[in-house]
A protein has these predicted regions:
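Acidic/glycine-enriched edge-of-secondary-structure segments
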Residues: 178-190, 214-217, 360-366, 398-403
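Active-site and donor-binding regions of nucleotide-sugar-utilizing enzymes
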Residues: 23, 35, 43, 55, ...
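Structural alpha-beta junctions
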Residues: 83-86, 234-245, 349-351, 415-426
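Basic, ligand-binding patches in group-transfer machinery
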Residues: 1-210
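Conserved catalytic-core segment of nucleotide-activated headgroup transferases in glycan assembly
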Residues: 221-232, 360-436
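A short, charged/proline- and glycine-enriched loop
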Residues: 203-213, 291, 385-388
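Generic recognition of flexible, low-complexity loop/linker segments
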Residues: 7-9, 200-202, 264, 283-285, ...
Length: 436
């Protein structure tokens, strides 16, 4: 099968006009070139496209591209839309030629970069454009730079507009400094109270052996792996021997109630067993007793993506000296094959990773449960009756809950729809909670 690609061979500027030259490989040449942001909420047509044979030249007037205004801040991919949609790629030969032209100093800077995407972006940095304006009151900066996105590993144009006050009044400056200082004082006071409650509780209950805490910063109730562990504990009547506590919060951005802010460090210090199922930043700075067990029952079923220290050097990943995850005494995973990957992700020794299987997958062996759930889904979604059902439940891209999104442009929906028609199938999308 012939490979289908659209390659970018050159980028150049004439005033506010951005020109992109390239060629088609195995793709029908068409003029329908567009810039689209990663969240697929903005789409802008090229002002002019010239095609000769298999080559193209697209022009974008960035000063008027967005409804008569300049292209707004964001990251944009270049696409060609026809029956299928193609994301334009930078030609590897173009990058190799740029690398050969580097000076020794540039080569040293290039080799010091941690990822291939950063290195490729370094080779592209001179193909951007910067517009600046200064006066006594304001500094304006508008920059467009071609790069390789660390989030989606695709060629993008990074657009950034900044407008800064050149001089601020002494009163405003003083207000800013005061506000910043008060926030720091407030944080330090709350942090000291949190640590004090934890340390007192840890000392008072140093010999405690019968308290268990379920806690999550991304779960509102006893669900997921927690639910199945808890139900098994009840089934074995362990609730008669153990005192079970739970502190939950729907997502990491939510604030705890005043009562939970006091109860949380108290239960952390008191409990012999502390079960978590996701990233939980409030526990990593604590010094637990040696006889306490911090047990990670990670929510994912297998090592399907990189997390934690497996993302060191990538955007949003921790640095090697981060304390995140490292105080787990045990982590339970789905199989022996996962031990290496979860030990790496959590920054813990491999013997602490135990392949028991994932609690919430037990239901896959419960025929009555499967029948009940299937009937429930068919009632809610009649479209799936008598169809092959495909569930797509991807992770997210972005550095956290504020920037979380999914790059839907990587899915060829036309081909997916064609497959569904041919095979009597329905695809269900279940997005990651962080990207809601």
């Amino acid at each position: 099968m012939t490979k289908q690609n659209i390659f970018i061979d050159d980028i150049y500027w004439e005033r506010v006009q951005l020109y992109v030259k390239g060629h088609f490989e195995g793709v029908k040449p068409t003029r329908n070139f567009l810039l689209r942001n990663l969240t697929e909420t903005k789409l802008f047509n090229a002002n002019h496209v010239n095609i000769q044979g298999s080559t193209f030249e697209a022009r974008f007037n960035i000063a008027i591209l967005e409804k008569g205004n300049f292209l707004s801040t964001g990251n944009y991919i270049l696409i060609n839309r026809q029956e299928d949609e193609y994301v334009c790629q930078i030609n590897p030969k173009f990058l190799n030629d740029k690398k050969k032209q580097m000076t020794l100093e540039e080569l040293r800077d290039y080799n010091s970069l941690e990822t291939q995407s950063l290195q490729k972006s370094y080779l592209l940095k001179n193909y951007g454009k910067s517009f600046q304006r200064y006066n006594n009151k304001e500094i304006k900066s508008y920059v467009i730079v071609p790069a390789i996105s660390q989030e989606i590993n695709e060629f993008i144009f990074k657009v950034q507009y900044k407008s800064e006050i050149n001089k601020i009044s002494k009163l405003k400056h003083l207000s800013f400094i005061l506000h910043k200082a008060l926030r720091k004082i407030s944080f330090n006071v709350r942090d000291k109270i949190y640590l004090s409650i934890f340390n007192i509780s840890k000392t008072v209950y140093k010999n405690n052996k019968n308290h268990v805490l379920f806690t999550s910063d991304s779960r509102a109730n006893m669900s997921g792996n927690f639910k199945f562990i808890y139900e098994e504990m009840l089934k074995q009547q362990l609730d008669k021997k153990l005192v079970i506590h739970s502190i939950f919060k729907p997502n990491i951005a939510n604030r705890r109630s005043f009562i939970d802010k006091l109860k949380f460090p108290y239960f952390l210090g008191k409990s012999k067993y502390i079960l978590v199922d996701d990233y939980h930043p409030m526990i990593y700075k604590l010094q637990f007793r040696e006889n306490q067990e911090i047990v990670q029952v990670w929510h994912a079923v297998g090592a399907f993506k990189t997390v934690g220290f497996s993302r060191t050097g990538k955007k949003g990943g921790p640095f090697i000296d981060s304390i995140g995850h490292k105080n787990y005494s045990k982590a339970y995973v789905s199989s022996n094959n996962d031990i290496l990957y979860y030990a790496e992700a959590f920054g813990i020794e491999e013997h602490k990773v135990i392949p028991t299987g994932v609690p919430r997958t037990d239901v896959l062996f419960d025929e009555s449960y499967k029948t009940r759930i299937k009937q429930s889904l068919e009632t809610k979604l009649p479209i799936i009756k008598n169809k092959k059902v495909i569930l797509f439940a991807p992770t997210f891209r972005g550095s956290g809950h504020r920037t979380a999104h999914y790059p839907f442009f990587k899915i060829n929906f036309a081909r997916l729809a064609s497959y569904c028609e041919e095979h009597q199938a329905t695809v269900l999308f279940k997005m990651h909670p962080v990207s809601y």
